[in-house]
Amino acid sequence: ALSLATPRRDNINALVDYLKNPTSYDGLDSIAEIHPSIKSADIYPRMRSLTDDDLYAIAGHIMLQPKVVSEKWGGGKIYF
């Protein structure tokens, strides 16, 4: 699913870009006001203190987790 987004979000650099400036799946609209991001740190205070290293770690986690807990990843609260 991440590879079908525009722009593709199936690599760490693309996910870091998304964490800084999130857009809709088609890439046309900014969703920063409704999604935590560096761009919306005034709305989401926890984003204020994140460094680029933190963002790369988060993106790496997102890329790795489906391989670790494949059926649970992205399944929401039903698995917990």
UniProtKB/Swiss-Prot annotation:
Keywords: Chloroplast, Electron transport, Heme, Iron, Membrane, Metal-binding, Photosynthesis, Photosystem II, Plastid, Thylakoid, Transport. Its main location: plastid. PSII is composed of 1 copy each of membrane proteins PsbA, PsbB, PsbC, PsbD, PsbE, PsbF, PsbH, PsbI, PsbJ, PsbK, PsbL, PsbM, PsbT, PsbY, PsbZ, Psb30/Ycf12, at least 3 peripheral proteins of the oxygen-evolving complex and a large number of cofactors. It forms dimeric complexes. This is Photosystem II extrinsic protein V. The keyword Membrane applies. Its cofactor is heme. The gene is psbV. Heme binds at M47. Belongs to the cytochrome c family. PsbV subfamily.
